[in-house]
Regions:
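M16/insulysin-pitrilysin zinc metalloprotease superfamily fold
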Residues: 2-70, 139-145
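C-terminal regions of mature proteins
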Residues: 46, 64-145
Length: 145
């Protein structure tokens, strides 16, 4: 954003019983693609290295607030229950879920983030004028560096 390389960028995750998915989406021009992908990888690695206990505490608070506020909606409760059955094969009590969130440490998150940033399997999907885009191999090398 600071460099004006993209008009939108966001990340999202999906968790399942035996796998997970982290997606980073960025909308940019073909001319900015190579620089944007490199900076995105560097930022993922930096975020893992620079993570503070305060950031993890804020993330825990946000997760718990979203979870507890979601209990006010019957559709959100039903979606949560279905997701829990899909992932865990049961619906754990809300207190158990909150306790699990509270037990996550900065070290836990840092180790996970470092793995995602440096070595988790990756895929690359591009559309539009992408002739100047680096290949997946080049991006993997930058992640591993």
């Amino acid at each position: 954003e600071k460099r004006g390389l993209c008009y939108t960028i966001f990340a999202q995750t999906g968790a399942y019983e035996d796998t997970g998915l982290t997606t980073i989406y960025a909308g940019t021009s073909g001319d900015e693609l190579a620089e944007l992908t490199g900076i995105t990888i560097d930022e993922m690695k930096r975020a893992a290295d620079d993570m503070t206990p305060e950031e993890v505490a804020r993330a825990r608070a946000q997760m718990k607030a979203g979870l507890l506020m979601g209990l006010e909606s019957s559709s959100a409760r039903a979606e949560r229950m279905a997701r829990m059955v899909q992932i865990w094969g049961k619906v754990p009590p809300i207190e158990e879920t909150v306790a699990r969130i509270d037990n996550v440490t900065t070290g836990d998150v840092r180790v996970f983030a470092e793995d995602i940033a440096a070595s988790a399997p990756a895929a690359l999907a591009l559309y539009g004028p992408v002739g100047k885009a680096p290949g997946l191999e080049a991006l993997q090398a930058r992640r591993a560096a």
